[in-house]
C-alpha cells in the first residue's frame, strides 16, 4: 500500500458527501474530514518536496482509517517519484534538457569542423590532380619521339662525317682527320645525352606513380570523412528528435498547470461546485475540470484534472484543501 493516495481521499470525501446527501446516515464529522484533509495536505507537500527513509508518512485503508508510520526503503521505492518530489524531478528534467542542448551544439561544431577537413582534402586532391597533369605534360615534352628522332639523326650524321673524315681518299691534311680519341669522345657525349633522357623519363614515371598513390590515399581519407559526416548527421537527427519531444512535453505540462490554476474553489458553506478552465503555453493548450466543497466558513477542499489538447499528451491533476482562521 502506497503512502496516502490523494485520489483515495478525494473519493472518500465525495462518497461521504454523496452518501450524506442521498441517505439518512449522518455525514462524517468536521473533525474527521479536517483530519483527513490535513493528512492529505501533508502528503501532498511530501509529493512536491520529496521524502526519505525515516520521515513520517500516513497510510489510509479502504475504510478511511489513517495510520501514521515511519517511511521505509520500500515506501520510497513505491513512490511515483522515488521519494525525490515533483520539484526535484522537474529540476532533473530541466538539467537533462540543458545537457541535450549542449550536446547538440557540440555535435554541430564537430560537423562544421569535419566539413572544413573535407574541404581541405578536396583542395589537396585538386592540387594533386593538377600536378599529375603537369607531370604528364612534362613527360610528353621530355620523351617526345621527335626529339629522340633528332638525336638519332645527329648520331647518324656524325657517323657519316666520321666515316668521311677517315676515308683516305678524301684526306688532304692531317688536321682534317678526326683522331680516334676525338671520335670516341663524340660517341660518349651522344651516349650520355641518350642516358640523361632515359633517366629523366624514368624519374617522371616515378613521380607520376607517387602522385597516383597520393590521389588514392586522399580518396581513402575523403571516403572516411564522408562516412564520419554521415554518422554525425544521424546522431544529430536523433538528438533533434529527443530535444523536440522534451520541448513538447514541457510545453504540455506548463499548459496543463496553467489550466489547473484557473479552477475556482467554492465560496459558500455547504455548497458543492463544478469548475472548468483552459490554459496554454506557446503552441500547446490544455483543458481542466474540477470540483470542490466548502464544509465550514474556515475549511474547504477541491480537486481537479487537466488534459492537453494535442495528441500524445498526459493528464495532470491536483487535490487541495483550504483552512482559514
From Swiss-Prot:
Domain notes for this protein: The signal peptide, cleaved at the inner membrane, guides the autotransporter protein to the periplasmic space. Insertion of the C-terminal translocator domain in the outer membrane forms a hydrophilic pore for the translocation of the passenger domain to the bacterial cell surface. The head region (residues 27-137) forms at the top of a long trimeric stalk.
Other observations noted: About 50% of hypervirulent serogroup B N.meningitidis encode this protein.
Family to which this protein belongs: Belongs to the autotransporter-2 (AT-2) (TC 1.B.40) family.
General function of this protein: An antigenic bacterial cell surface protein that adheres to and induces bacterial uptake by human epithelial cells.
Cell location: Cell surface; Cell outer membrane
Annotated source species: Neisseria meningitidis serogroup B
Protein name: Neisseria adhesin A
Alphabetical UniProt keywords: Cell outer membrane, Coiled coil, Membrane, Signal, Transmembrane, Transmembrane beta strand, Transport, Virulence
Signal peptide annotation: 1-23
Amino acid at each position: 500500500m502506497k503512502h496516502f493516495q490523494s485520489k483515495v481521499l478525494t473519493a472518500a470525501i465525495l462518497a461521504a458527501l454523496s452518501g450524506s446527501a442521498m441517505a439518512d446516515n449522518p455525514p462524517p464529522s468536521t473533525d474527521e474530514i479536517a483530519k483527513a484533509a490535513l493528512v492529505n495536505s501533508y502528503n501532498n507537500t511530501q509529493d512536491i518536496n520529496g521524502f526519505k527513509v525515516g520521515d513520517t508518512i500516513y497510510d489510509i485503508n479502504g475504510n478511511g482509517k489513517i495510520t501514521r508510520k515511519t517511511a521505509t526503503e520500500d515506501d520510497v521505492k513505491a513512490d511515483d517519484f522515488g521519494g525525490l518530489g515533483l520539484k526535484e524531478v522537474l529540476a532533473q528534467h530541466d538539467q537533462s534538457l540543458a545537457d541535450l542542448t549542449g550536446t547538440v551544439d557540440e555535435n554541430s561544431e564537430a560537423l562544421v569542423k569535419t566539413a572544413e577537413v573535407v574541404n581541405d582534402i578536396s583542395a589537396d586532391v585538386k592540387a594533386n590532380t593538377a600536378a599529375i597533369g603537369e607531370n604528364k605534360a612534362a613527360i610528353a615534352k621530355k620523351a617526345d619521339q621527335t626529339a629522340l628522332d633528332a638525336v638519332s639523326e645527329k648520331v647518324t650524321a656524325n657517323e657519316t662525317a666520321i666515316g668521311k673524315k677517315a676515308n683516305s681518299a678524301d684526306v688532304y691534311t692531317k688536321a682534317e682527320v678526326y683522331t680516334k680519341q676525338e671520335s670516341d669522345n663524340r660517341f660518349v657525349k651522344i651516349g650520355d645525352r641518350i642516358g640523361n633522357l632515359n633517366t629523366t623519363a624514368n624519374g617522371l614515371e616515378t613521380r607520376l606513380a607517387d602522385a597516383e598513390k597520393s590521389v588514392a590515399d586522399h580518396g581513402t581519407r575523403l571516403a572516411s570523412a564522408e562516412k564520419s559526416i554521415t554518422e554525425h548527421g544521424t546522431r544529430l537527427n536523433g538528438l533533434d528528435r529527443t530535444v523536440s519531444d522534451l520541448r513538447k512535453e514541457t510545453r504540455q505540462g506548463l499548459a496543463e498547470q496553467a489550466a489547473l490554476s484557473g479552477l475556482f474553489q467554492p465560496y459558500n458553506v455547504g455548497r458543492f461546485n463544478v469548475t472548468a478552465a483552459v490554459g496554454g503555453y506557446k503552441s500547446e493548450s490544455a483543458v481542466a475540470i474540477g470540483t470542490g466543497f466548502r464544509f465550514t466558513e474556515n475549511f474547504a477542499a477541491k480537486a481537479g484534472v487537466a488534459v492537453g489538447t494535442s495528441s500524445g499528451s498526459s493528464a495532470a491533476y491536483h487535490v487541495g484543501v483550504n483552512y482559514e482562521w
